[in-house]
Amino acid sequence: MESFFNIRYEFDKNEVHNAIARRLTKPGSDYICVSDGNILNNTYKDHDYLNVINGGMFSICDSSYVPLYLRWIYGIKRPQYAGSDIFRDIVSQRKYRMIFLGAQQKTLDSLKKELSKMNPDVKSMTFEELPFLDVEDFDYEGIARMIEHDKADIIWISLGAPKQERFMAKLKPHLGHGVMIAIGATFNFFSGLDIKRAPEWMIRNHMEFIYRIFSEPSKQIKRCQGIISTLPALLRREYTNKKNRKERPVKEIAG
């Protein structure tokens, strides 16, 4: 685990999965954040939200740009591990019982149908639409009881950032077992409905944000404006932090 931009990242994909397996052998629950550019922007502006992001097990790097920034600043290689990738990896393993929370019921129904092709066990799993509420207003005790009755190991949450991360932090003290992972639009990507992830060639060339802008212009343009407005200060701060590091990061970590 390493800290960059004040966020605790786990870049080693194998260690991500090992950490999940270890956590599930112990009492209590925890959560993993899937940190993209929007989360990076929000943590820079909101220290309380930064504490939420770092209050879980760790973050995985959903942003394709953070690895570029780390190469520019530190000369190191770090892999991206997108939310849609960890979602596909865990669902296809057929290792855990899962529960899927959030999104509209239409999306959840289609998601269940599509995921069942990847993992037939999904047919017996719970897909639950959550009410449209402020994050303070959810019945966290009731949601925890539902999850524990379901005996889910992995709790997938799709409420959009920053709401879904705050949701996990508030649910954590009520939940006796499980690892929560908030994955935003990934439910939509895998549902087979309107919103899809960018083609692989765009992802490889750090152009996914362009695809997302055309898919959801009103939402994504606002996000991009926020990211661009804070990026110079964020990079400048990390350059300063580099000088204060006692140990230089290792050159490369395998994805």
Predicted regions, residues:
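Short, flexible loop segments at boundaries between secondary-structure elements
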Residues: 130-135, 176-213
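N-terminal nucleotide/polyanion-binding subdomain common to many enzyme families
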Residues: 1-79, 84-85
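Proline-aspartate-enriched helix->loop->beta-strand connector
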Residues: 147, 151-156, 161, 177
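A short helix->loop->beta-strand "cap" motif at the edges of active sites that frequently abuts
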Residues: 29, 96, 175-179
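Conserved beta-alpha
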Residues: 67-146, 150
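A transmembrane-helix-recognition feature enriched in membrane-embedded lipid enzymes
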Residues: 68, 197-252
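Short glycine-rich anion-binding loops that position phosphate/pyrophosphate groups of nucleotides
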Residues: 37-39, 159-164, 186-187
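Short Gly/Thr/Asp-enriched flexible loops that form oxyanion-binding sites at enzyme active sites
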Residues: 112, 165-174
